[in-house]
């Protein structure tokens, strides 16, 4: 997966997630680790498990539509 596909996935996430959830995300980063595509989602400390579930579902479902299997990693920051 290249930068263009990553940007497409993140833009979809920003356009489809509820604004109240997006406000709790500080940053997205992309890396490849041991052959896996990983999107790191940096979140504020007040994110609830349900909101994290919505983020991961949004990213994974759209990624699969684009033909990629993505791992989502949540980090505080």
Give the positions of each predicted feature:
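Short low-complexity stretches enriched in small and charged residues
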Residues: 1, 25-30, 70-71
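N-terminal presequence-like segments and adjacent domain-start helices
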Residues: 1-8
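Ligand-binding pocket scaffold of soluble enzyme catalytic domains
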Residues: 16
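A short interface-forming secondary-structure element
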Residues: 29, 37-54
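A short amphipathic beta-strand at an alpha->beta junction
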Residues: 63-77
């Amino acid at each position: 997966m290249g930068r263009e596909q990553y940007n497409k996935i993140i833009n979809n996430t920003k356009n489809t997630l509820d604004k109240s959830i997006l406000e709790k995300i500080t940053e997205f980063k992309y890396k490849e680790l041991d052959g896996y595509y990983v999107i790191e989602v940096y979140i504020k400390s007040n994110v609830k498990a349900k909101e994290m579930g919505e983020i991961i579902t949004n990213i994974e479902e759209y990624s699969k539509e684009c033909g990629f299997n993505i791992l989502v990693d949540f980090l505080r920051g």
